[in-house]
């Protein structure tokens, strides 16, 4: 028999009035007696505080501050403590004889709220000899001791071997230890459980019928059917979870589309941008490299252009200089040609003028002769006319004078004066100052003789003049010719000069005859000289172009070498063309192949992605299509095997589910029909009677009853005999046992127990041997154990089934994936890697481009060499025929020599041309020059002088004649003499005047006619002279101009000058064309250089910008790559097939995905913000952050109970696999989990019946309890009418309400609540939810109404109420109920802890004086029968004959208050180990 645990003692340390007091507790009743304020309530408060250290519950109302409502106010504990560390400890010993000390350390907290700090602790393994006060106090001297702190207590206990000290931070842990060690009767899991326990202690402490306990008797007495309730809750939770999971599946199915859409669009959005940046980075790198290559190429090209520019500029300078000289030469040649042409024209004019002059000269000579003759005749006529005129004038004068003298006397003076004038004139003319009128006559004769002599001399001279004039004209003509040829010279030198001129003329004519041959020779030599100069120029240019000076002898060898080089270069160029064509053809083929591979690469990459996914899914590596098809066959075989194994596991799981369902039947009935038969027969299933059998006893009772363990126990078999007739709806074997279901035992069989077996003697001649089953299922504990093992097996099977189903689904998905792969990608998946081929071909293309560039460079050099060789050969072809010219070093000297000879010949020709006619004229008359006819001039002078002398003589004679004639006038003596003497003279004068006038008229006519003729002759002569002089002057001018021109105007000069001009013009044109070409080339070169310079600057800028962009992008890209790798999304984003799309296509793809994403994340603020931030094109890492955020968001939305991965992409794949399987499995589970309303009603009814039976058994123990007029106490349990109606409807009319129970939107609890509301519309449910109401309706305790009844006096059974009972009756009744509650708790907790522990039972009763002696005795009897300890507080001693009584007296000693305690043990026999402490404790 298991001994019940007991409280041994209560120790108070440093409490008010108790410094170190230990109260030994009696095994039954401990009485605390004393007056008011003695410390009874303090002692009980210390006990309750150690038992329930919860300040939220502790409330000692007899000392609590009146009217206080604040939770922070003192609840009566603060005033019971003294300052410092306080302890309250309970010393217990449990059923296992283990000493356990539990207690609390209390300490007042400073402040006006009067709070108390409580620390619970426990001590195990303490020796029995150690008293609790020794643990927590330290003796200082005989009268002083010190209280240890909790830390000191722990250190002290740590030093004691085998002693364990535990300090608790949680009251739940403290109570859990006390429950496990059997100190308290119930496991206090929560504050609600602690509150119930405290209310029970409080009710027992203050006595009476507690309204709180009465109202909640169901919670105290009716055990919570945790198994059934947990089963309902688990079922509902499973159903709820199942439905939530199904809903989650449906959500997940929608999420799958969302996942697909979001992942697809996010992947397109980010991967397109990622690959675009990757492509752009590669493009930028390629562009940077291309820029750098182009930069270097441009620099080289610019340097080449600069060198070329320098060469062309130098050549252009040379051509400009040459052009200046050529222009000067050409202009000189043109001018020379013009001069030659002018000279020729001048020469023609000169010749023409010379011919004209010769003709004019002849005419002039003839006209001179005519004019001279006419002049002579004119002179004669003038003289004759003058003489006649003079004579007429004289005669008229004389006649006038005479007439005047005759007419007027005064004329005499006039005549005298005239005579004087005539004398004076005669003196003057005759140079005779002494002339007198008288000598005038003499002198007249003299002078007339002189006149006659002069006339004769003049006539002789005229004759001489006519003779000498011919010789003189020839000499003058010859002299003029010599003078014209030689220039002015002395007349005496004319002969010698003329002879020299004639000899020189012969030489000059000989030289002049050589002009044309010399000119032709000179022209030929000049042509050769020009060709030599041209050859030298060509040689210089050739050497300059060849960059080397060559000798003339080397040119032929060089020509042959160049010819050979041209042949080899021509072959090289032709072969290079073929090679270039072959390279370009290969390059085009490579480009075409690369294009084809680039088109095939995305398809191949898609196939590789699919193949890699297949390889990852199946863990195999495939190298050929045959392996894929073989693995597909293996996959089909594996799928068949997995399906077979899954079906087997499913069948076993269904069997386990059926067994679990069978074992889960209420009452242990494996057949539902047994419950119906038991209810029909009014019996109870045997399994239900033995439902509480322990797990250890289950094999025994299972073997004991054998097949009849499913029997129905009925009160009377005879009453059901009639009901057995016609019974068909029952098991094949139905066992019926007669007996009282309330007090049934196993005495119906005679049993012999063997080792692990029993022998049941059914009759004298029938025994049954039954071994203990290895897996008993008799009794709830055995069934629960079996169900637990079955659940474990079911979990394993479910997991295995889920795994197999997953594998089957996965295999099927894999099979479908393989089928799709075979249909779509098998033809290309195992082809060679196009990207590797592209890389190889790109390498080859780069080699070809490099080879082409090298070939082009070589070919260009060869072409340049070929062109140079051709130019060299062309130049040599022009040079080689002129080698003899180049070798002729005397050509220039010969040209100079011929030029000099030609100059001499031309000079001679000009001399002959100029003076040839004069020499021809001179040659026949040159002999006249031998003698100079100098007398001709003298004759002319003599003739003129004689003519003048004749004229003078004639004038003198006339003057003298006039004087002589006027001699009379000198002596007028009288006028008569003068008149008479002059009348004859007058007549003579008149006659003479007439003759003279006639002579004068004749002379005038002759003079006039000769004058007109002479004038005509003179005019002709003048015109001839003028024409001659003009032409002579023009000829002289032309000759001077011709001399000024300084050119030789021969017949070939113009042709040579024109040819020279044309040659120079051709050279100038060639030079200009070359210069223009060079200028254009130079301009083009400068433009090219400028373009190259601009291009170079742009390239440098672009290169630096691109390089900076590449470097900047590299840093950003490194961050992007780091973020990609850190988050493991590189495989998702680096989609190689996108590398073959253009930037516009990728940007379009990203923009489309962005538009879709904006709609997809419109309801998600976080993703929307991240997406908005990711739209910044300058921050590509934000797109990665968005992608990671999407993945994180999707990871958070992955149902881990459905999908076992964190990768949303894999989650989609698993969704596809899991969803259909989970949907099917969960649907079937829901069908299996779904319980019928009839089953629920039966379970609740059976539970109610069982608890009613248990309450009846508890009532049997209360039947003998009596207090005062109360003869008996009982509990009455009834089913509420509303709930009974609910059970009836659930059992019999559930079909009418299937709309509630078949709804997938309602749980069973909610459907039950809806049904309850439907059945009881008058009841107000308040704010409670249907789920809460349904859970309450699933608790059978809510179906019961429980009340306490007492049998009091003559009133019979009455409801126990405080107003109907006396105080003592109420206290006794309440104590009885509390004892029943404690017993009920123990029965309920027996299954929760070891069977070898019987917990302590202890109750309190304060103010027990209100009970009479009979009631006290009843309490003592109740405590003894129930092995319960009781602590009573009363002012007086109560039953000192039993139990232990402590007398408490509060005293003041030396201003120190303490409680004096005296213990008295009762008269009853003492239990061993009980001691009474008589020495009071004093507070130090």
From Swiss-Prot:
Keywords: ATP-binding, Cell cycle, Cell division, Chromosome partition, Coiled coil, Cytoplasm, DNA condensation, DNA-binding, Nucleotide-binding. It is found in: Cytoplasm, Nucleoid. ATP binds at residues 34-41. Residues 1049-1074 are annotated as: Disordered. Residues 666-783 are annotated as: Flexible hinge. One of its GO terms (molecular function) is DNA binding. GO terms for biological process: cell division; chromosome condensation; chromosome segregation; DNA replication. One of its GO terms (cellular component) is nucleoid. Residues 1051-1065 have a biased composition (Basic and acidic residues). It comes from the Bacteria. Residues 326-418, 444-472, 509-602, 835-923, 977-1116, 1209-1265 form a coiled coil. The keyword Iron does not apply. Plays a central role in chromosome condensation, segregation and cell cycle progression. Functions as a homodimer, which is essential for chromosome partition. Involved in negative DNA supercoiling in vivo, and by this means organize and compact chromosomes. May achieve or facilitate chromosome segregation by condensation DNA from both sides of a centrally located replisome during cell division. Homodimerization via its hinge domain. Binds to DNA via its C-terminal region. Interacts, and probably forms a ternary complex, with MukE and MukF via its C-terminal region. The complex formation is stimulated by calcium or magnesium. Interacts with tubulin-related protein FtsZ. The hinge domain, which separates the large intramolecular coiled coil regions, allows the homodimerization, forming a V-shaped homodimer. Belongs to the SMC family. MukB subfamily. This is Chromosome partition protein MukB. The lineage of its organism: Bacteria, Pseudomonadati, Pseudomonadota, Gammaproteobacteria, Enterobacterales.
